[in-house]
Each structure stands twice: as structure tokens, then as C-alpha cells.
């Protein structure tokens, strides 16, 4: 009798250390883009809702760039696609507001 071997979809082994490392890189990217976009919003003088819309656009752009970079092999680097869209989003918002208000104050107030 011939043994039937079922093929598994996805990677055969997922290293937890690699997944944590990828999450750390994703968090670093999100924090860096948040700081850069916050500084840009502050220099441009965006206030109120326009500033938060700018953050959402920057976050969406980063997520799209990460998806384009990973292409169809996202499951090789992450367990699901959700971290690519939502990973570090709230922490990035705090960084964004910090840089936004600091540079707005430095450029437009003083």
C-alpha cells in the first residue's frame, strides 16, 4: 500500500523568535513613520481633524508598502495579516501627537 502524505499549506515551521523579531521590526517601522509624519504635520501647520487624517493616511500608506514588500509571502513572516495593518497603531499615535505638537509649537508658535 502506498502511503498518502497530505501537504500542508504555509510554512512547515514557525520560529517564535523570528515572529517576535518581525514584530519588533514592524513596531520600529511604525514608530519611525509616526515620528516623521508627526514632524511633517507640525511643520505644515496641520491642526485638529486634518492632523489626525494625516496620521491615518500615513499609517495606511505604511501598511500598503509593507503588503507590497511581503507580497504573497506574508505568511512566511507573520502568523496573520492583521499585524501589518494594526500592529503598533496606538503607540504610533502617541509618537505622532508628540512630534506633531512639538514641531507645531517650535515652528508656528515661537
From Swiss-Prot:
One Pfam family of this chain: EMC6
Protein topology in the membrane: Multi-pass membrane protein
Domain of life of the organism encoding this protein: Eukaryota
Upper taxonomic lineage: Eukaryota, Metazoa, Chordata, Craniata, Vertebrata
Keyword Membrane on entry: yes
Protein source organism: Bos taurus (Bovine)
Cystine bridges: none
Subunit structure: Component of the ER membrane protein complex (EMC).
Topology, Lumenal side: 45-50, 107-110
Name assigned to this protein: ER membrane protein complex subunit 6
Annotated transmembrane regions: 29-44, 51-71, 90-106
Amino acid at each position: 500500500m502506498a502511503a498518502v502524505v497530505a501537504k500542508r499549506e504555509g510554512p512547515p515551521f514557525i520560529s517564535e523568535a523570528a515572529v517576535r523579531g518581525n514584530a519588533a521590526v514592524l513596531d520600529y517601522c511604525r514608530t519611525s513613520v509616526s515620528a516623521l509624519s508627526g514632524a511633517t504635520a507640525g511643520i505644515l501647520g496641520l491642526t485638529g481633524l486634518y492632523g489626525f487624517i494625516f496620521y491615518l493616511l500615513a499609517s495606511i500608506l505604511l501598511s500598503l508598502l509593507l503588503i507590497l514588500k511581503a507580497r504573497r509571502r506574508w505568511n512566511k513572516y507573520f502568523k496573520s495579516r492583521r499585524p501589518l495593518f494594526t500592529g503598533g497603531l496606538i503607540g504610533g499615535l502617541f509618537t505622532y501627537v508628540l512630534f506633531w505638537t512639538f514641531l507645531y509649537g517650535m515652528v508656528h508658535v515661537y
